[in-house]
Amino acid sequence: SNIPVIIFGGRTPISEHSHFGCRNTPIGYGQEMRDQAALVRESVKWDFELRYADQAGEHVDRAWAIANSLPKGPVYLSLPREPLCETFATDSAALNCRPSQQPISFSPAPDSLSMAATLIANARHPVIFSQRGARTRQAFDLISTFVEQWAIPVVEYWGTEVTISAAHPMY
């Protein structure tokens, strides 16, 4: 439903010895799934398994950007026990930086906008049918102003996000 979510899933250890967090009890063998991410792979936009603790910041950054790119949706990060047991410097630049990867947003080609404007201007009774909403506050305000100035009704059929206010005269 276009909702950005980061899902974290813990895993049993991936190593047999020599690493803090390795398998040290028999229960780890019985509970291990060969491909845990397969449970969610068909329902998420991206999945990844963290292998080293000091990469947590960059992978969460990437997960956030992908989850928030249109169409927004869930992503999955698998966390084996070893990286969760590792120690690393918490003042690491990778952990304490602003997001480096930004969500992607799409814009129509300028000639497509021109064509749409011509169709709307020449329509006898234009109506806007919407489902996915305005997406941003700026778009919400622009659409609200546009439909009021042009007296174009907006119908939200099976809406998942709001396009204009339900109190708007053109709603």
Predicted regions located by residue number:
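N-terminal alpha/beta PP-like core and its mobile active-site loop of ThDP/TPP-dependent enzymes
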Residues: 1-171
